[in-house]
């Protein structure tokens, strides 16, 4: 008689989840298998899952029984409180003892016999779940006693420290003897101004970095000196070139400076030591006056053809209307044009 409650499997049979198959169906499965019917046919005929049929037949072939559950009954519980107490004692005496050593000692001390002694896996589980917490707590207490006081955490990275008024004051004021010096990286972080000035955008170095830059052969002015810097400070350079730049180019940049705006008045000049030298410009042929179309000028390559001359690198004749002038005359003409434009 089928139970009144249960679930329906894919074959249409009714089963109860978690309950063994009835003994009558088990016996019928074994009888059909002895008649030579395949397990898949038995599964479709009795509407029992194929896995259940295979499991029952495998158990019958091994043990000769069709009853569910363990044949010899369940194993009695071996991890009694007495055994756990002895295991804890062994672990406290020798914290580095292994599970198999505990098992051998239980047998040697007569706590257990060969029938009820716990397995190595059971002893490991007891050590991990019941005794491991106590051992870890003891190790933590001993470690906490020997642990030094924690160092105060830095508010930011000490390698790339932001300049601050406190660090600047500490750099100026000498430290009295007997008082430990406070490193600049432990100071409070910089309070950024509300207005975005040119000094903040360019990231001008503060006084705290002056000690690092003193070793360099170039002189870098302080923050207080930036407002007093002007065009006259750069007049002591060479008359023809300043750090690889021509004098005319510097004068043109000085004349066409940025227009004043609403930002705080900060000089836009940068010291020559902080500027990387510009690459040397390529030598250009002397200036020439021309009467042909502008499209006739093509920038020549550095190499020359085998049959060409320095004046005609592409082995072509230059029109007679192109009259070359000397370098000095061309420069004088360019200066006069620049003066008239101003």
Curated annotation (Swiss-Prot):
Q: Which residues form a coiled coil?
A: none
Return the annotated region ranges for PAI subdomain: 7-63
Name where it mostly resides: nucleus
What are the protein's UniProt keywords?
Answer: Developmental protein, DNA-binding, Nucleus, Paired box, Transcription, Transcription regulation
Q: Which intervals of the chain are annotated as region RED subdomain?
A: 82-130
Highest rank taxon of the organism: Eukaryota
GO annotation, biological process: cellular response to growth factor stimulus; endoderm development; face morphogenesis; negative regulation of DNA-templated transcription; odontogenesis; positive regulation of transcription by RNA polymerase II; regulation of odontogenesis; regulation of transcription by RNA polymerase II
Q: Which GO terms describe its cellular component?
A: nucleus
Q: Which Pfam families match?
A: PAX (PF00292)
Question: What task does this protein carry out?
Answer: Transcription factor required for normal development of thymus, parathyroid glands, ultimobranchial bodies, teeth, skeletal elements of skull and larynx as well as distal limbs.
The protein's name is Paired box protein Pax-9
Q: Which organism is it from?
A: Rattus norvegicus (Rat)
């Amino acid at each position: 008689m089928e139970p009144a409650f249960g679930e329906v499997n894919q074959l249409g049979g009714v089963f109860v989840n978690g309950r063994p198959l009835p003994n009558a169906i088990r016996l019928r499965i074994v009888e059909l298998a002895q008649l030579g019917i395949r397990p898949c046919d038995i599964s479709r005929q009795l509407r029992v899952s194929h896995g259940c049929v295979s499991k029952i037949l495998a158990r019958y072939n091994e043990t000769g029984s069709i009853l569910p559950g363990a044949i010899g009954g369940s194993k009695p519980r071996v991890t009694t409180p007495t055994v756990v107490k002895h295991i804890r004692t062994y672990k406290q005496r020798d914290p580095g003892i292994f599970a198999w050593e505990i098992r051998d000692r239980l047998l040697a001390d007569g706590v257990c016999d060969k029938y009820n002694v716990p397995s190595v896996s059971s002893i490991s589980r007891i050590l991990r779940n019941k005794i491991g917490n106590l051992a870890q707590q003891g190790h933590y207490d001993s470690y906490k006693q020997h642990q030094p006081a924690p160092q105060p955490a830095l508010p930011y990275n000490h390698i790339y420290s932001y300049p601050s008024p406190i660090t600047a004051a500490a750099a100026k004021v000498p430290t009295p003897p007997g008082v430990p010096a406070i490193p600049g990286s432990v100071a409070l972080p910089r309070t950024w101004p509300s207005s975005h000035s040119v000094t903040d955008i360019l990231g001008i170095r503060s006084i705290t970095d002056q000690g690092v830059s003193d070793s360099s052969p170039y002189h870098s002015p302080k923050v207080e000196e930036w407002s007093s810097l002007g065009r006259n400070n750069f007049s002591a350079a060479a008359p023809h070139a300043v750090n690889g730049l021509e004098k005319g180019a510097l004068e043109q940049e000085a004349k066409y400076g940025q227009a004043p705006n609403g930002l705080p008045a900060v000089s836009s000049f940068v010291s020559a030591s902080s500027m990387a030298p510009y690459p040397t410009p390529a030598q250009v042929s002397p200036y020439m006056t021309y009467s042909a179309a502008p499209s006739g000028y093509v920038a020549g390559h550095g190499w020359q053809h085998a049959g060409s001359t320095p004046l005609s690198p592409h082995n072509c004749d230059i029109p007679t209307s192109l009259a070359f002038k000397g370098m000095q005359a061309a420069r004088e003409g360019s200066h006069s044009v620049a003066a008239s434009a101003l």
